[in-house]
């Protein structure tokens, strides 16, 4: 299998691995919320940070929907540039979020991980959607 033809399964696997880790963080977000708070915190501070993390994770799930829609519909499945960007971003996100989950990183770091590793590929996916459906160009 050549390097180009292996981008499609690699993209699917890294996208799915990133999705699984985001869902895992959703289920066990209490430890990460506690890592964001000072030692003496109020229930209101906990609730505020928990809501912030829920919003960030929900935005990430929305960005996954955009990427899966473009990928599974075939619009960007064979686009080499998008596949390479997506594989790199989601592999980086997978590793970063594993550290975020197990090391108890601060919640504000999640926004950085989301913006570079989820929002960037989703924005390029939207650009490909516009090029294909709006300007009637080939997806390759």
UniProtKB/Swiss-Prot annotation:
Keywords: Cilium biogenesis/degradation, Developmental protein, Glycoprotein, Membrane, Transmembrane, Transmembrane helix
InterPro entries tied to this protein: TMEM107
Topology in membrane: Multi-pass membrane protein
Role, per record: May play a role in cilia formation and embryonic patterning.
Keyword Transmembrane in annotation: yes
Subcellular locations according to the entry: Membrane
Protein name (Swiss-Prot/TrEMBL): Transmembrane protein 107
Signal peptide positions (record): none
């Amino acid at each position: 299998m050549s390097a180009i033809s292996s981008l499609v399964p690699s993209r699917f696997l890294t996208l799915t691995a990133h999705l699984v880790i985001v869902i895992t963080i959703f289920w066990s977000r209490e430890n990460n919320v506690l890592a964001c708070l000072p030692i003496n915190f109020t229930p209101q501070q906990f609730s505020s940070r928990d809501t912030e993390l829920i919003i960030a994770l929900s935005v990430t799930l929305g960005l996954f929907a955009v990427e899966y829609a473009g990928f599974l519909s075939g619009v960007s499945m064979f686009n080499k540039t998008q596949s390479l960007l997506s594989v790199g971003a989601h592999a980086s996100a997978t590793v970063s979020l594993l550290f975020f989950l197990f090391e108890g990183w601060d919640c504000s770091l999640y926004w950085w991980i989301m913006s570079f590793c989820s929002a960037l590929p989703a924005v390029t996916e939207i650009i490909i959607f516009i090029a294909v459906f709006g300007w009637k160009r080939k997806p390759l």
